């Protein structure tokens, strides 16, 4: 769980830094919105990290991603599509999976560990948070500050 806590702390720091820069000369209402949005996103991020660590998810997918990551590092990207395996993802995501497997090896995580499963889920978690940020940004223009937070 240490990796998740570090990632959550870094994410919170980046969000607060960005919010502080964006609203440093802004009115009190905008600064309050930035605080509430930061807290909401931090809570959502921590919730996803805790769920990602404690629940296995759909093990067929996560185990497949883990095996693709290990295979990409062992045979290389030039040979991975020539292997006798089921591989229906484009090479772009395989680069991400290979990087995650290198991180697993760097930290010495076993293939079956919940921490590595969380690491495999991290691109989806970050993409989910980015989409939520985009929805907040767009809805804030149409709905206003606080109604957008509830969307």
Each model region followed by its residue ranges:
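Hydrophobic membrane-targeting alpha-helices
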Residues: 18-22, 49, 99, 103, ...
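Membrane-embedded helix bundles of polyisoprenyl
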Residues: 44, 145-151
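Membrane-embedded glycan-lipid processing machinery
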Residues: 85, 89, 116-126, 151
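Transmembrane-helix motifs of polytopic, lipid-linked glycan transferases
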Residues: 118-146
């Amino acid at each position: 769980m240490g990796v998740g806590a570090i990632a959550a702390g870094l994410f919170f720091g980046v969000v607060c830094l960005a919010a502080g820069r964006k609203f440093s000369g802004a009115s009190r209402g905008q600064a309050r919105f930035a605080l509430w949005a930061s807290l909401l996103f931090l809570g959502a991020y921590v919730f996803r990290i805790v769920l990602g660590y404690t629940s296995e998810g759909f093990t067929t997918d996560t185990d497949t991603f883990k095996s693709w990551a290990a295979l990409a590092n062992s045979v290389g990207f030039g040979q991975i599509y020539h292997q006798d395996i089921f591989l229906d993802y484009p090479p772009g995501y395989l680069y991400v999976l290979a990087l995650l497997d290198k991180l697993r090896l760097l930290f010495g995580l076993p293939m079956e560990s919940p921490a590595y499963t969380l690491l495999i889920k991290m691109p989806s978690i970050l993409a989910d948070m980015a989409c939520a940020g985009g929805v907040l940004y767009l809805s804030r223009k149409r709905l206003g500050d606080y109604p957008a937070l509830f969307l």
